[in-house]
From Swiss-Prot:
Belongs to the SRP19 family. The gene is srp19. Its main location: cytoplasm. Pfam families: SRP19 (PF01922). The keyword Lipoprotein does not apply. GO terms for molecular function: 7S RNA binding. This is Signal recognition particle 19 kDa protein. It comes from the Archaea.
Length: 92
């Protein structure tokens, strides 16, 4: 199953109405596509980065997205794992 991960989903700078899926405590300030892909690499999950894509809620910004091929976790579990890995890597 393919899952789309937009940086907005885990961005603490965005509101729920703007597309954030995680709580403020779980989310990350301004996550980058590079950080998301590094996190997925650590989790050993296959992914494809698409740099020229825009989140529909902010179509004027080319934020990029990551297409993930996985079936082990729900989308929310995956987002939490990605955000946690990014937080851990920023603290080191």
């Amino acid at each position: 199953m393919k899952t789309i991960i937009w940086p907005t989903y885990i961005n603490s700078e965005h509101s729920r109405g703007e597309g954030r899926k995680l709580s403020l405590e779980e989310s990350v300030e301004e996550p980058k596509i590079r950080e998301i892909s590094q996190s997925l690499k650590k989790l050993k999950i296959q992914y494809v980065v698409e740099h020229n894509k825009s989140y529909p809620g902010s179509w004027w910004e080319k934020s990029g997205r990551v297409v993930v091929e996985q079936e082990d976790m729900t989308k929310l579990e995956l987002l939490r794992a990605i955000a946690k890995n990014i937080k851990n890597s920023r603290n080191n």
